[in-house]
Structure formats: C-alpha cells, structure tokens
Amino acid sequence: MLYIAVRTSEEGLPMELWSRRKFFLASLAGSAAASAGKLFGGSRSNGGDAPTLASFAPVAQGKRPLIISSSNGLHALGAGMDILKKGGDTLDAVVAAVTIVEDDPNDDSVGYGGLPNEEGEVELDASVMHGPTHRAGSVASVRRIKNVSRLAKTVMEKTNHVMIVGDGARRFAVAEGFEEMNLLTEHSRKIWLAWKAKSSFNWRPGIDSPEWKEHLSAIFDGNEKQIAYAERVIAHPPTGTIPCMAVDSNGDISATTTTSGLSWKIPGRVGDSPIIGAGCCVDNEVGAAGSTGKGEENIKISGGHTIIEMLRQGKSPTDACLEAMGRVARNYKNDKKKLGTFHIYFYAINKDGAHGAASLWRNGYEASKQASYAVHEGSEARLAACTPFFDAVGGDQ
C-alpha cells in the first residue's frame, strides 16, 4: 500500500502517514469545501465575489501560548497571558482577562456599566467552553450580577446543566456567593435617558422643539464628546461583546464570550454570546471561535460551529471566519444594501496557535476606523486587522 508523508515533527517524532484511501478522501473533502465556498460567496477583501482555491492562504504555524479577543479586550489580555505562562488552565486565563473589562465602569460593552435594555435594566449574557474536558456553561438575561463569565464557569463546574437564564441564573449566582448590585452607571444611565428622549415623544421637549439640543446638552452637562458618542449609539445601537480564546503550550484550548447584548433591546432578548456553537465554540482537537456584532445573524448560521468545522478541514483561522461570513451574506443574497444595516465579526484560533478574524465590512463601528482584534503571543498585546468580507465601509454608517 502506498503511503504519503504529510508532516514531520520538529522534535524528530515519526511522520504522520496517510494511506492512499485517506489521501483520496481528504482530497474529496477539499473539493467539496471549494464548491461550498463558491455557493456561499465572498472571500478575502474581494467585494463579495465567489472565492477560488487560490484565495485561501496556507495555514501558518502559530505561537503557543496564545490569547486573543475582540479589540475592546486589548488591555486585559496580559492578565490571561500571565496565567498561561505559569502553566495555568486556559479557561482560567480567558475568564481572568474578560473579568477585567466586566469590572470596568468606563467600558459600556460588558458587565458593570453595560448599556441597558429599553427599560434601563442592564441584562448580561455569557458562555464558556473548556476544551480539555469537553464541558460548557452559559447564562443569559442575567440582571444585577456583574461577572457573568465567571457565573457561566460556575454553571459548568457546579451543575450538570449547560445554560441557566433569567431570574433563575440570578438566584443561582446569589446561592453561589455572587454579589448583587446595580449595574447601571451614571454614564450608561445618561445615554439611556438620551435614547429615551430621542425615541419617545413623552421623554423629550417635542419632535420639532428647538429645545432638543439644549435638552441633550443638559443631560451631559455640555460635554460635546459625550453628546457625540450618545448620538452615535442612539442612532446605531451597539452590540457590546468580548469573545476571548486561548491555547496553552500543550495545545489545550478554552474560550469565553461575555456581553451586555444589544443596547435598548426588548427585555429578555438573547443574542449569540451565550449560545454554544454560535457565539462560543471550542473543539480541543481543532481550535476555538467566537463572534461580536449582530448576534441574530450568527445564530442563524451557527457561526462558531461552522468555523470549527472549516478549521477541521484544514482552513486557516482567517479563511474559516470568511467562510462563516459568506453564509451570513448568502442569507441576504449578497445584497450590500441589506447587509449594510449591521456589523458582524468572527474570531478564531487553531490548536497550533495560528489566529485570524474577519469582519463583514472594512470598518469597525466607527466608519473611520479599521476593524481589528487583540492578540497576545507572549510579549505584549497588540491589535491586528480583521480581514473584510466586503472591502467597503458599511454597517449603517
């Protein structure tokens, strides 16, 4: 029987060999993946044309340990890397990193100070997955509990459930010693009041009133920077989220995603962040994936699971993310006008420590800024550019 050598270990270990039959099956899978890419449309910065085999980059060797997150976790990755360097567990590392942001009252994307629902209540969601033990935990629509990533980890460790939601999750948290607190900061409360004023006749001087600007100025004490920020998030409600994933020097992988969800949402709305296989997905033999942006679009394609399966087929993290993005675009028949009403981003790592991310549009939530994500490979945290599916500005700017 003919054998084909496909990889040699740097440590001089025996080569992994494939039989002729396995090689044929692998080639067949690659052909199927290429056909799927043409069906889904879109590729690396090409404006949405169907991808070709040449558009997929070879998988580069990464570095381990590694920890990545969305860009709003940049300053927190060091805490996770410290745990990885000391030989700590990958799940402890990612939860430690996002907890820093959950605790930060000046960050309105997650945790304390997150932007509230339409009634002014902050509702949080989170999920965790632990690759080595194949376990998961999540919580959704949680009020008055700040560190929901840690709460999701507690669900995983202390129960035989995967998800607990709403008041049940709050009561579980209290029973486990979590502190209840008012999560609405003065900053977030003022933005919510401004949104109410903009969205309801009953909460503002009047739709044509010349006093509107004075009213908004009074809410923010004349702070022009805060007024401009409030006007932007009122017009384009953000989906504040941090996915974070890590691989250690042994190749073990974990991930978490934590969020305050869509600003001004209907109470009880749940996005992709706490959904295992959508906003968070880990396979310890392959890699990890997460997402930010409009969670409903990710749920419809099971984005995290899709990315993991693309990694399993041998695609790089970036190309795996672009494949998932292609499915989002396919649902709208690549109609840029419809797709232009929202943002979505995918992030991934593989077992070797390679990493990548894709954005639907070239820009982040601000049209002038390129979409990016945070990476820490052992020396210091840095930002890396997301690869856009459409090389254009979008997202209801």
Regions found by a protein language model. Give the residues of each.
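Alpha/propeptide regions of enzymes that mature by internal proteolysis
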Residues: E16-W18, L25-L28, A32, N46-Q397
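C-terminal segment of classical bacterial N-terminal signal peptides
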Residues: G37-K38
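N-terminal secretory signal peptides
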Residues: M1-W18
